[in-house]
From Swiss-Prot:
One of the Pfam families matching this protein, by short name: Ribosomal_S7
SUPFAM superfamilies per record: Ribosomal protein S7
Entry-linked CDD domains: uS7_Bacteria (cd14869)
PROSITE patterns to which the protein is assigned, alphabetical: RIBOSOMAL_S7
Record organism: Stutzerimonas stutzeri (strain A1501) (Pseudomonas stutzeri)
Task performed by this protein: One of the primary rRNA binding proteins, it binds directly to 16S rRNA where it nucleates assembly of the head domain of the 30S subunit. Is located at the subunit interface close to the decoding center, probably blocks exit of the E-site tRNA.
Family: Belongs to the universal ribosomal protein uS7 family.
MF (Gene Ontology): rRNA binding; structural constituent of ribosome; tRNA binding
Subunit record text: Part of the 30S ribosomal subunit. Contacts proteins S9 and S11.
Keyword annotations of the record: Ribonucleoprotein, Ribosomal protein, RNA-binding, rRNA-binding, tRNA-binding
Record field: transmembrane: none
Entries under PANTHER family matching the protein: RIBOSOMAL PROTEIN S7 (PTHR11205)
Swiss-Prot/TrEMBL GO biological process terms: translation
Listed name of the protein: Small ribosomal subunit protein uS7
Length: 156
């Protein structure tokens, strides 16, 4: 057990444009080297592109895309008698969102468009339609969990 006290959770303020807490957290995932203004410009630019293409509420598209990426189960390694098993476990809601955001940003960074805002917009729209690299990542994780269902009795 750790000897120190558990660090207090920092409160994240809602983003200024849409007033959404989840969008503010997403900006923190996009941010590199503490450059929040750059991250805001990228995210708002991406949402503007989504609004142009979808003619709807970009925040709704963002939330549905995140939901399409968020995993329900994942595998954790568990060592039992010299053998390591991949044990499927349910994902906590906070971790679901964190993984979805991480996978979305990673998939966007690997895309080929010119600017990060365009990449992010493209990945958001793909995820909204149930395709794209981030959704593929989720399906791979679910497939791994399904393949290792036999070891689910080794729960943590």
């Amino acid at each position: 057990m750790p000897r120190r006290r558990v660090a207090a959770k920092r409160e994240i303020l809602d983003d200024p444009k849409y007033g959404s807490l989840i969008l503010a957290k997403f900006m923190n995932h996009v941010m590199e080297s503490g450059k929040k203004a750059v991250a805001e410009r990228i995210v708002y630019g991406a949402l503007d592109k989504v609004k142009e293409r979808k003619n709807g509420d970009p925040l709704e598209v963002f939330e549905k895309a995140l939901d399409a990426i968020a995993p329900l189960v994942e595998v954790k390694s568990r060592r039992v008698g010299g053998a390591t098993y991949q044990v499927p476990v349910e994902v906590r809601p906070s971790r679901r969102n964190a993984l979805a955001m991480r996978w979305l940003v990673d998939a966007a960074r690997k895309r080929g468009e010119k600017s990060m805002a365009l990449r992010l917009a493209g990945e958001l729209l793909d995820a909204f339609e149930g395709k794209g690299a981030a959704v593929k990542k989720r399906e791979d994780v679910h497939r791994m969990a399904e393949a290792n269902k036999a070891f689910s009795h080794y729960r943590f």
